[in-house]
Amino acid sequence: MVGVLGVAGLLGLLWLERRTALTLPTPTGSFAVGRGIYDWTDDKTMDTLAPGPGSKRELLVWIWYPAAAGQSATIDDYLPAQVRAPVLPAGGPLVFRVLSRVFGLLTRDLSKVHGHSFRDADVSPQQRSYPVVIMRAGASLEVWNYSTLAEDLASHGYVVVGFDAPYRTGVVVFPDGRVMRRTPENNPELFSGEELLSIRILQAWQVARPKATMQVEEHKHD
């Protein structure tokens, strides 16, 4: 009986925690923070991990940057609705899928998590240019898990370009609603450190091309 009450109490606390609003730590720099989310496609490179042949390599790119102060832009959601929507496992036993849904109901409701980034805000005119930091989450995590760090860097005058790679990141949800999962062939435990490093370098090179600068420049002229 005591055990049952203990479990019930724990579940109740988890449910209350799920329903409680949470705001990320306030950035410590002097700049306001803007954020844009983009779908970049490399027309010259095929994605060798895509389930079908002929798929061009895509990246989901998140850019945090120093934003102009005093504008009427909207504070963006910590996560867009389509990203935070629960995504059930694509396959597997029914029991596993049910447990995954139950676990999702007892973890924090991400719609109640709030950040400090303005959606597609104008770039701050205080400097002619800003240094760029390329951010890639470790293993197969999504880059939005590092939003607090990205916002803080942007508030200190850095452009932070983070990206998720389909079939390599755990789950990638593009703005148009497409969901791409990591493939079993890309389990990080199957690769050596050198192999993982070479893969990360190639992905970072794709992001480091002039397109990142061009994307931020667009916000200077909106």
Task: Please name every model-derived segment.
Residues 2-12:
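Hydrophobic membrane-insertion alpha-helices, especially the h-region
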Residues 13-133:
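Domain-level recognition of soluble alpha/beta enzyme cores
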Residues 83, 91-158, 164-222:
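Cap/lid segment of the alpha/beta-hydrolase catalytic domain
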